[in-house]
């Protein structure tokens, strides 16, 4: 199949059908993919059980799944309104890069991060905290391990001190729109 299964918009139907747990399908999914997908489905399921009668999927939850590398989404064989198997262009859609992980929050604006992909001072970054709702922040400055201010983070796994305009919780994934 050249598309990826996405059932986030059908949580009520799945729960009513007796499904009580969800599994991430596919081989070699990254930690970033797993974190984003787990966070989205966890919020969707919790929101559904908090308000089963008037459940509406919050737009940010579905938007999260567009921030991971994926092929075009469909619902597979679950419903009859589209083909369950599609054999066409199976190209991947990639709108975001995971650029860092927050190792430690020092204060309201300073974090120790481990770089994953290149980004620059001044970039708007999208933060996925370990729990809670993702938020945007701006990279105000970067300092390398020698205390030298740098304009970019070009070296994978480099530890940097980053100042931003928000507190970034420890273990947050920091990403950037391409």
Each predicted region: which residue ranges?
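Surface-exposed amphipathic alpha-helical tracts and adjacent flexible/coil segments at the periphery
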Residues: 1-178
